[in-house]
Amino acid sequence: MKAVSIELTTNKVLYEPGEDITVNVMVRGLMSREDIELTVIKDSQEITKRVLQAIPPESEIMDYVRINDVGTYEISARCCGSEVRTPVMIINRPETPLRFVLVFHNHQPIHKYPSGIYHGPWAFQHTWSPEFYPIYDVGPYLLHARLVNKYRVSVTYNLSPSLLWQWDDLLRNGVFIEGADHVEYIGPWDSRVGLIKEAINTYSRLANEGVIEVLTSFLAHPIAGYLIEKFEVYDLLRWELSRGKEVTRRVLGVNAVGMWLPELYFSEKLRNILCDEGIRFIVLDGVYHLGEAIKDRSSIYRVYRHDCLTILFRDTALSDLLSFQLNKASNAQEADANARRLIIELMMRINYARDGVVTMALDGENWMILPTPNPYAALLLEKIMMYLSQAKSDGYVMPIRPSIIKEFHDEIKEIPTTSWLGSPAKWISERADIQSRLWSMAQAAISKWRLYEEVFGEDEELRMSLAMTLDSDYYWAEFVNVNHVGEWAHSVISRAEDALNSLGIRFSLENDHLEITVSNNWVKDANLVLGIETPETYLEYSIKVQSGSSEPIRINGFNNVVISLLSPKTRTQIRKPIKIVREVTKH
């Protein structure tokens, strides 16, 4: 026999004392006329109860209740052994609404090998696939755009440059995607590409209309704070941020002034890079980054200044509530109730954030799709936006874009070097056997890149390859990818070695003078130092050898000469020294 099902909702989440609460009850699967007990509950105690009548086979009943005292309540409907509850909050309307910044990090690493073949379709699949069927017919990235367009709520999106880069790659070139037994080519004419265009156009329009804020980031999602501390890759990270901003501007038409710091991994050594690139604000973690600066419960909601940067600290508990708990909704009733719980939790912070900002920051997609796509988590997202829109109209909450914040409360002098997890362990040591191999490959690639650029100067292709090598996603313990890191590291090393091996050196002797000729068969000019050591002296000659040409140097004598080809700054040996020994003829 089919079980009776009950759905219960109210017209809003937040009410003033004494305001009418419209209650809707839907009962399905009735075989006979039944009583429905409608109860108002506070702290597990029944406040009021009334009995309604339900008529088979299904009934939709509307009723009204009033609650005069402020607080959090549940409204319960019970029938035929089944019960559902939905939470509401009775709260006095504030003089000024609670300012709220909601940040979603919509991101995919560039799932591409140096061969040009994608080893993962996720940037595309999570946009166009009906992963939340039967409720929605698209993936999370497009769903976000459609829902914000529908409810017009101010939301801040980090559409990561690596995600945008892949969308743009598809539109410009088409993509090759690796399968189990074949490689699929998806051309720009594919019908699914229309959904990618819709996502781009919707986000772009919403940004230009001032509905959403778009954050930029580094191009390939490096663990920037860790990398700059461990490897001091200042030039690479400066380049990555510049290129990330270019991608955001080219694909969306947005000149972003805020950025998402990958893995929220901060280091003071990043500060000048961000400031020099025109970044005005970032979001960090309220637990691990604010840390010892927390003085009271209002500290996390204050706006801080750090050099050029305005810093918002996310409410970690509120963010994690959605990421790891409320997202487990298994039906529509739970999705609605969980959205209400989030709004209520938000409003419970109003007394601590009266002149500040409550910030939530979390992944935009993972809480809906991992371990498998959950249609009711997607429904939860829509309910959150619906109730936020309602709370804004009623004057309780004001969702805002971070860039409109002009004031700050405190200067923060020092911010710990750490991630949203409080350490780098997730990327370096949780699976140390594999991760240590990855970091060894990364170190080798960084060393070769440094030597190459010291000799040949900045190289876009090489920097892109190194950025792909260092993407944090492929070092994450649960998703380590030896093939991706290994192939891109090899790409860096082999290009650098090909270039360095294209430098030649030859000798000729004329009138007891040794002529040393350095040739350059690489595509870029080479800056070098030629070290010449004799038993008596050591001399260095700085030389620039243009691409496809050679430069001669003449020295007097050549007995026991050691000749070294060196990089110009660090004097790194480009190859083993060459020793010339002149045999002394005995008479």
Sequence positions of predicted segments:
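Active-site and substrate-binding clefts of carbohydrate-active enzymes
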Residues: 16, 93-152, 161-164, 170-186, ...
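Asparagine-centered strand-capping/turn motif at beta-strand->loop junctions
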Residues: 27-29, 518-522
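Short, hydrophobic beta-strand segments
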Residues: 62-69, 553-558
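Terminal connector regions
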Residues: 70-92, 557-586
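Metal-dependent polysaccharide deacetylase catalytic core of the NodB/CE4 family, i.e.
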Residues: 161-261, 307-327, 364, 406
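Catalytic domains of cell-wall/extracellular-matrix polysaccharide-remodeling enzymes
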Residues: 239-295, 366-387
